[in-house]
Amino acid sequence: MSDEYDENDLKRRMDGAIESLRKEFAGLRTGRASAGLLEPIKVDAYGTPTPINQLGNISVPEPRMITLQVWDKNMVAAVDKAIRNSGIGLNPVMEGQLLRIPIPPLNEERRAEIAKLAGNYAEHARVAVRNVRRDGMDALKKMEKDGDLSEDEQKAFSEDVQKLTNEAIKRIDENLKSKQEEIMQV
């Protein structure tokens, strides 16, 4: 078999799409405190956009509270400003180098918007998985055309690729269902 078709590579790329989806889901506000909520936020630190988790320790002491212990006292105001301007509706309370970030409950309309956004993220992941499937199928067709595979081998490998795709899409749908239930939970 040639290097052009590698089932492990296809599986790795599909898993990557699912992992990317999980990271996007972690950044969605559900009304429950989560360190992942702050991960997408970048702070202008010393002239460079820096991920917030590189500027302090993030912890979740209570279900509706995130604390952020900023290491450099000169960065506390910049971190506070970045969180307030992030668009996720959080208002930190400064206590020296510690920021307390209460998580307000979500109203029904906002929950529906976030659930819809989660659906969009899942659709992007499905498209990524289908693109990986297409790449695998194209490689198999090319190998058959070049004489590296018989028609029967190509069909068998195509079924394997389709099976991988179905499993990946099923995992995406399970993640989406779980996240939407979490979002809609009052």
From Swiss-Prot:
It comes from the Bacteria. Coiled coil: none annotated. The keyword Nucleotidyltransferase does not apply. It is found in: Cytoplasm. GO terms for molecular function: ribosomal large subunit binding. The gene is frr. This is Ribosome-recycling factor. Belongs to the RRF family. Responsible for the release of ribosomes from messenger RNA at the termination of protein biosynthesis. May increase the efficiency of translation by recycling ribosomes from one round of translation to another. Keywords: Cytoplasm, Protein biosynthesis.
